[in-house]
């Protein structure tokens, strides 16, 4: 390995320039002999003094932005000026401009950027109003500009938040309000309590504002706003604050809620935004900004944190309870029995209610502390505010990262590429129950493919920034993961989790729509290589190819003909290990041989498998399973051998937990009774698979469904969404009617988008049948009638459950397991 000595200022400058231009991180490997030795890319750098790791290269400009300013907790934009706020409470005005990029020099004020990417010219403005006028004009020629001035500043100048800080350092005020109504515009609306938990410099301060101590709630809110300005927190957090708390306070304050730094008011956006939950569901809200502070809505934070969609509800109290964060002895309040509007004048009740509310801020702060670290540390690299990190999708964050990597050096930036559909990964299962199943997977398959096969867009990304950053994040994550395991220090685990988010999102970013640096062709290439790797692995194990065949043809021979495909095993067998394939799923496959292997045997098998692949494509031991039940493609049940279990994979009795894979098995909306039925049937299938016993179990639930005593066991969970609130289909209308009935009966006091509700299927008399929108009649003119099925809240249960519906649901649930139930 070539050595390079730093022995004067010029040699120091040369190596610093190399590090900056190539976006590499120098690694100190030795300084025991008085010589500082660093590994930089593929050569060794030596110096008699610590010349490399100084402020100039402390933060890799590709990863953290070129500006090394530390302890930034917020950036504000006001009156054509930018303000930078630091953790010590200081602030300064910093230079910055607004800008529009174009593909041509549309007038002499457009200046040429470096490089050959699409947006080659930049027009900069000192006036925000002039910029807005120019932006409106730029739509005619397809110009590009940042979404907001603050992100624009960060993209152009390389600022990022929280450099040199840890997640617990910024000051945080968690708050919650109690009100008399659900809508601040209704008669009798009033904010009666504001609970606060402030953490600043490691010290917790709690304060409760009570409307009874003021002449009106407006005067209380003004006093609270004054207190917020005095305490000067960098972060405001609360649960569902965008849609409820801040909106309510804003209205009740006369739309002049001055809680920002430099005496600035809260500002709501004119147009709605959407917080995405998953590919099919999002929540509409109006974004709010507070000058010099970040607003973190812990409901949105929970949505981003709950990747596995395990929360039964996104309400604050249910999440706190589910996560085991509830304060011991915490007072609970029954709002139905004692609504806020009726207890304010009852001194004893009010005293109890105050005690209940005093800890409300603690709950939001507990969620913040648990969930924020990964986003906090990722924010040190991504040129967005912390608030934007929570409210936006990962693809947008990576895109900003990539734009910054070029624009901060006045380099032209890319134009988005139209996304196209492409073939995905291989998934197939051979139904049946298997014993002693080996499972192998490729660690970080898609990122590994990107690096191994050099997958990046040579035209859009000429300096290879995407792959360089991916390599750096991968290497740093491995170091932090190892440090976390060796030391048990949470900081390292938080860092590696942040890095994991970006690493695992790179592939999805390439295939996304509307992003400057997307690369759909590259995403297709990655999945193609992924399929090749899986096919090669399966052939090594079984000697058989997996081939794609037509599963179904719709409208055959017509213009709108549509074919669906499936993967199956070819009959041809070649020399191999002679194993039997069980399942294939994206980055893994499982197989069986004779008996349970020893750990040494399995290790040798994996070594043999890895010997036929490139170094970065590494197959790993994903466990040996005592039982695996494959139902269909992407739906299977796993029970590990105890010897292969980590402590967290054992239940309270020390037995291996059962893992369910697939939508049919993990449906979170399934009724509790049917979830229970599925669990007991799975247990029986894995422990005997006795057909008579299984039939007896099914009959037990059929009997319960015909005579329901506890309707809560038969309720389905639904999320109250905009589509449900505004929809005109039967399900949406049934939900709207159920909500209206519950509000009128005061079963619920309010409902808002994102709330989880539980409903059961009921019968309310009869209604005339319809077909294609028309009422149906018998030949003699009599109307054809059917049951009038509706949805109801369980609190309104009147022994009116729909027996036929629930018997059908039992049948559907049992049929999920039909392929593996013993039929002998």
Segments and roles (model prediction):
Residues 245-254, 443-457:
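Short active-site loop/helix that positions an aromatic residue
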Residues 234-241, 551, 582-583, 590-592:
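Short glycine-rich phosphate-binding loop at a beta-alpha junction
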Residues 206, 211, 232, 236, ...:
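Active-site-proximal helix-loop-helix substrate-binding element of RNase H-like nuclease domains
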Residues 589-604:
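Catalytic palm subdomain of template-directed nucleic-acid polymerases
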Residues 1-22, 28, 337-444, 448-453, ...:
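Common nucleic-acid-contacting/processivity interface regions adjacent to the catalytic cores
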């Amino acid at each position: 390995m070539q050595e390079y000595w730093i022995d004067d200022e010029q040699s120091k400058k040369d190596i610093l320039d190399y590090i900056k231009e190539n976006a590499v991180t120098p690694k100190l490997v030795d300084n025991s002999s008085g010589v500082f030795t660093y590994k930089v890319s593929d050569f060794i750098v030596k110096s008699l003094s610590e010349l490399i790791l100084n402020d100039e290269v402390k933060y890799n400009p590709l990863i953290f932005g070129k500006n090394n300013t530390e302890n930034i907790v917020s950036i504000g934009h006001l009156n054509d000026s930018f303000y930078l706020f630091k953790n010590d409470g200081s602030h300064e005005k910093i230079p910055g401009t607004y800008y529009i990029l174009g593909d041509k020099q549309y007038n002499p004020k457009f200046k040429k950027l470096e490089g050959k990417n699409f947006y080659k010219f930049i027009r900069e403005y000192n006036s925000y109003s002039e910029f807005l006028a120019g932006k409106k004009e730029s739509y005619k020629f397809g110009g590009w500009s940042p979404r907001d001035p603050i992100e624009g500043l960060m993209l152009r100048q390389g600022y990022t938040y929280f450099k040199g800080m840890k997640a617990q350092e910024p000051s945080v005020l968690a708050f919650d309000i109690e009100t008399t109504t659900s809508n601040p515009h209704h008669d009798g609306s009033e904010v009666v309590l504001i609970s606060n938990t402030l953490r600043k410099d490691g010290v917790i301060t709690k304060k409760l504002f009570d409307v009874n101590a003021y002449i009106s709630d407006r005067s209380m809110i003004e006093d609270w706003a004054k207190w917020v300005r005095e305490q000067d927190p960098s972060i405001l957090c609360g649960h569902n604050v965008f849609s409820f708390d801040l909106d309510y306070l804003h209205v009740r304050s006369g739309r002049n809620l001055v809680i920002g730094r430099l005496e600035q008011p809260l500002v709501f956006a004119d147009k709605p935004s959407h917080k995405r939950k998953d590919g099919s569901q999002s929540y509409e809200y109006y974004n709010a900004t507070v000058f010099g502070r970040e607003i973190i809505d812990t409901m949105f934070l929970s949505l981003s944190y709950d990747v596995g969609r395990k929360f039964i509800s996104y309400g604050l109290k249910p999440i706190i309870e589910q996560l085991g964060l509830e304060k011991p002895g915490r007072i609970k309040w029954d709002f139905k029995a004692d609504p806020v509007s009726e207890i304010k004048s009852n001194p004893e009740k009010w005293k109890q209610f105050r005690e209940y509310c005093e800890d409300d801020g603690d709950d939001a702060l507990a969620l913040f502390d648990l969930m924020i670290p990964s986003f906090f540390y990722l924010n040190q690299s991504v040129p967005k505010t912390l608030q934007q990190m929570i409210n936006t999708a990962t693809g947008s964050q990576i895109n900003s990262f990539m734009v910054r990597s070029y624009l901060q050096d006045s380099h032209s930036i890319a134009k988005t590429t139209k996304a196209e559909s492409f073939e995905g990964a291989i998934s197939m299962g051979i139904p049946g129950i298997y014993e002693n199943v080996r499972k192998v997977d490729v660690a970080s398959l898609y990122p590994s493919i990107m690096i191994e096969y050099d997958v990046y867009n040579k035209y859009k990304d000429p300096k290879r920034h995407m792959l360089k950053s991916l390599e750096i994040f991968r290497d740093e994550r491995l170091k932090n993961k190892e440090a976390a395991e060796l030391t048990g220090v949470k900081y390292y685990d938080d860092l590696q989790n942040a890095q994991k988010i970006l690493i695992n999102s790179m592939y999805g970013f390439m295939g996304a729509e509307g992003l400057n640096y997307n690369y759909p062709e590259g995403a297709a290439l990655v999945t193609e290589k992924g399929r090749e790797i899986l096919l090669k692995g399966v052939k090594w194990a079984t000697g058989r190819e997996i081939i794609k065949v037509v599963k179904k043809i719709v409208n055959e021979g017509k213009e709108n003909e549509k074919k669906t495909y499936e993967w199956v095993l070819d009959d041809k067998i070649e020399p191999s290990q002679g194993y039997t394939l069980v399942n294939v799923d994206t980055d893994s496959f499982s197989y069986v041989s004779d008996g349970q292997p020893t750990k040494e045997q399995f290790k040798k098998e994996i070594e043999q498998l890895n010997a036929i692949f490139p170094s970065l494509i590494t197959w790993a031991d994903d466990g040996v399973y005592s039982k695996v039940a494959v139902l269909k493609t992407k739906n299977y049940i796993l029970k590990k051998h105890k010897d292969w279990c980590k402590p967290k994979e054992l239940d309270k009795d020390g037995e291996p937990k059962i893992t369910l894979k697939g939508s049919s098995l993990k449906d979170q909306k399934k009724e509790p009774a049917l979830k229970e039925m599925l669990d007991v049937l799975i247990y029986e299938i894995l422990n005997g698979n006795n057909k008579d016993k299984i039939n007896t179990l099914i009959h037990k639930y059929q009997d319960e469904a015909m005579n329901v005593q506890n309707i809560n066991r038969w309720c389905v969970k639904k999320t109250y969404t905009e589509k449900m609130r505004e929809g005109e289909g039967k399900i949406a209308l049934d939900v709207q009617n159920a909500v209206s009935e519950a509000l009128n009966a005061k079963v619920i006091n309010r409902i808002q988008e994102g709330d989880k509700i539980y409903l059961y299927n009921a019968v309310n008399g009869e209604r005339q049948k319809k077909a294609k929108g028309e009422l149906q009649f018998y030949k003699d003119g009599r109307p054809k009638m059917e049951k009038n099925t509706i949805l109801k809240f369980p609190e309104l249960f009147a022994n009116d459950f729909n027996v036929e519906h629930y018997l059908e649901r039992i049948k559907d649930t049992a049929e999920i397991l039909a392929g593996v139930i013993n039929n002998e």
